[in-house]
Amino acid sequence: VMVERLDHVAHESTDGWNNAGTGHAGYCELNYTPETDDGDVTIDRALQINAQFEVSLQLWSYLVEQGILPEPSTFINRTPHQSFVWGEKDVAFLKRRYERLSAHHLFRDMEYTESPKDLEEWMPLIVNNRDPMQRVAATRIKHGSDVDFGSLTRSMVSWLETQPNFELMLSSPVHYIDQRDNGRWKLRVKNQKTGELTKLETGFVFLGAGGGALPLLQKSGIEEARGYGGFPVSGQWLVCGKPDIVQQHDSKVYGKAPIGAPPMSVPHLDTRIINGEPALLFGPFAGFTTRFLKQGSIFDLIGSVKSTNLKPMLSVSKSNMDLTRYLIGEVFQSHSDRVASLRNFFPDAMEEDWQLRMAGQRVQIIKQVDGGGGKLEFGTEIVAAKDGTLAALLGASPGASTAANAMINVIERCFPEKIKTPEWQERMKELVPSYGHSLVEDEALLTEVRARTLSTLKLG
């Protein structure tokens, strides 16, 4: 049984316009490769995220080959991933990043250039009419992707609806969740259209509700949820659909976040293909909000404050006042202010060609640390009950791009004995051929699985 609060699936954070649609692989996202105090570049997180995205590509390839997913271009399209920086310091950083990453087999196809001729070919919209005295540099990986996660998810659910043992309950928020003495879970859901109350009982519950996962996790009452809170962040994009502009840019170009800005604010100018229609997107422009979902309540944040997480949340609030001020400042930006930021990437941008569009909500994890204080996390995390009967996925980026790997982790944690059986091992390797092996360490295996996914998903 799949229970959905809205009257259709994948229309919150998963929907096409509610996220950047980047197939997060660490190719262009500079915040995944932080600079150390001694000037070196740390690449561990980029390697991890790249390997996790390869898991998603393998699963999607299998589903396409089996006819479960439709033509790949309906949900994923080849879109080069590029990083672009300006100024002596950032150019030096990007070159060090390139040297570190390209030496590893996961990133062996990365290119680097400071050549005006190359840049004119790679990103004409960005270099046209740029100050010729400004030092700039870029990296590129051609087999990056733009993903319409909304289309992907709806295609998966459409197939599930054809299966005999699947039921989809729409317009049905969960009002009650509690574990019985026998370890099974009782849930009550109420249909918002008919008022009908349905009682469910199950041996396993997964909470994959984006920003709505934290309140449901708190309702479950599991001990492992104690100390967790959420810091909601809204988002906005500048969007352009004018064909004469859109056709000049065919890539995702990520820059560096401004000094003092949080990792979530890394600016990027993206090609998007949603419902088959190309457009350009620039952002994100973050904002302060108290909602956990785009279609949530202004009381979501205050409603999530419990005695078990009050101290961590107060600790984070106190230690992140700069972040709060930054987010509030973002809210009060004018259209001209936002277009001025865009001109750092696209010097010829005109205000009248771009419209503001709301993105989805992100709920960053607040996690209790030793001593009872709190820490703000910028990734994703699985929280699971000790007995393996309930699990939830919390957090934001890299989000949907690594969802397949996250669900494998859920299976391993919640079904530890079954996953060891030959039947389950065989099935996992059928879905994800690299299962049980490290793509970070095994170059030959990476070469094999990447050749298959690039071909099947038409990304090569």
Where are these regions (language model features)?
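Flavin (primarily FAD) binding-site architecture
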Residues: L207-E223
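Flavin (FAD/FMN) cofactor-binding and adjacent substrate-gating region
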Residues: P70-T79, F84-S158, T162-Q163, E167-M169, ...
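Glycine-rich FAD pyrophosphate-binding loop
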Residues: V1-G16
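C-terminal catalytic lobe of FAD-dependent flavoproteins
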Residues: Q134-H143, S151, F288, F292-K420
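Dinucleotide-binding Rossmann-like beta1-alpha1 core, especially the glycine-rich loop
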Residues: G21-E121, A279, T289-R291, S297-D300
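An anion/pyrophosphate-binding glycine-rich loop and adjacent beta-alpha core
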Residues: Q247-K318
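Core beta-strand elements of the Rossmann-like FAD/NAD(P) dinucleotide-binding domain
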Residues: K193-F204
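Central beta-strand plus flanking loop segment that forms part of the substrate or channel wall
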Residues: A25-Y27, E224-K252
